[in-house]
Amino acid sequence: MAASTGKLRTLFSAHSSLSARPSSALPALRLTILRSYATTTPPDSSISNPSNPSTTVKRPPTAFKDKLNAGPAFSDFVSGKKDEPLDPAEAYALKTALVGPAGRKKEITRLPSWLKTPIPDSSNYKRIKNDLRGLNLHTVCEEARCPNISDCWGGSSKSAATATIMLMGDTCTRGCRFCSVKTSNKPPPLDPHEPENTAEALSRWGLGYVVLTSVDRDDLADGGARHFAETVLKIKQKAPNILVECLTGDYAGDLEMVALVANSGLDVYAHNVETVEALTPFVRDRRATFQQSLRVLKAAKATKPELITKTSLMLGLGETEAQLWDTLRALRAIDVDVVTFGQYMRPTKRHMAVHEYVRPDVFDMWKERALEMGFLYCASGPLVRSSYKAGEAFIENVLKKKRGKNVGSASGKGTTSENVEKLVAGEAVR
């Protein structure tokens, strides 16, 4: 009992000594506590802390930053969430009308008649879809939700149909704000059987013209260029007379990879600038630039001058007439042969809103202007896409002018198995 009482007295005396300390010691203690927080301003203004984030100068907001932040970010495309389809009010928000009795009118939206397309349900559409699924192939027609799929796939026979095969999977490493293709930083590995399966499918259909495109694969050292070129060579082996158009990415500006694809035996090298230079940072992934796209098209033509080069632009994003003129001049300066114009249509809620629905007569006007500037062919219309009826347009308007009658055998060069082996080994096919 005496020992317990002694302990209590000791604790009490220690507490009393702490309480009896002068208040002058407290400010030093408080200063130490405040300094333990990195974001707290010291009480003495003469004390400076260079590492303090609160002292860094913030850049004033800019119109570019505000506009970019208001739109979808890269993370929106890699979230893995399922896309929600747009309702008419969001997809066609620029065409509105007030309907209903007085005092209870409500605003509704109207779809321009020139943008209406039928629902794909033909037997030929189903046959092509089944063939693609059986060979584990993808098409940009489906992945990009092209409005022309019922027209392109709905012919009376497979030979009358047009399908754009999308190589290297259905997942892209870029997040362009207009495109509904799935996005991921780490897409699945390439299918080594895809070149052979693609060639097999196309040889079954007996097509005279095919369009190959691909997702961007920035995760691969060559951007997938060798895979792309090998597919072209396999197609030419199985169907030497088929005309092949390749709509490629920019391969992160690697012009050696551009040359590799250009030398693979294709007939048309296509790469889309998508929009005018001023809008490119808002529309495309930040890794894609307008000038880089021009360099790709220029390199393809320089590698093989007899190639047809082609590009495509979307209208309705907010571009001006002067900007379109500048774009066409830049394309002609590097000898691009074919250009197409189409209406941008917002695919999902995550993507850019439509700025304007361009009238069909305006598309006709730009077609005339492009032809007057020296383009060999221009397809221009609200529903025109880069590969829309590409074979028909190519055969009727480009090959007859540039290659004459013997176009079927013009692209048989460089299609031997020896070239395929060189390609896989990393050598350019000449």
UniProtKB/Swiss-Prot annotation:
CDD domains: Radical_SAM. One of its GO terms (molecular function) is 4 iron, 4 sulfur cluster binding. [4Fe-4S] cluster 2 binds at residues 172, 176, 179. The keyword Hydrolase does not apply. It is found in: Mitochondrion. It comes from the Eukaryota. Pathway: Protein modification; protein lipoylation via endogenous pathway; protein N(6)-(lipoyl)lysine from octanoyl-[acyl-carrier-protein]: step 2/2. Keywords: 4Fe-4S, Iron, Iron-sulfur, Metal-binding, Mitochondrion, S-adenosyl-L-methionine, Transferase, Transit peptide. Its cofactor is [4Fe-4S] cluster. [4Fe-4S] cluster 1 binds at residues 141, 146, 152, 387. Binds 2 [4Fe-4S] clusters per subunit. One cluster is coordinated with 3 cysteines and an exchangeable S-adenosyl-L-methionine. Its EC number is 2.8.1.8. Its main location: mitochondrion. It catalyses: [[Fe-S] cluster scaffold protein carrying a second [4Fe-4S](2+) cluster] + N(6)-octanoyl-L-lysyl-[protein] + 2 oxidized [2Fe-2S]-[ferredoxin] + 2 S-adenosyl-L-methionine + 4 H(+) = [[Fe-S] cluster scaffold protein] + N(6)-[(R)-dihydrolipoyl]-L-lysyl-[protein] + 4 Fe(3+) + 2 hydrogen sulfide + 2 5'-deoxyadenosine + 2 L-methionine + 2 reduced [2Fe-2S]-[ferredoxin]. The keyword Zinc does not apply. HAMAP family: Lipoyl_synth. Belongs to the radical SAM superfamily. Lipoyl synthase family. This is Lipoyl synthase, mitochondrial. It comes from Blastomyces gilchristii (strain SLH14081) (Blastomyces dermatitidis).
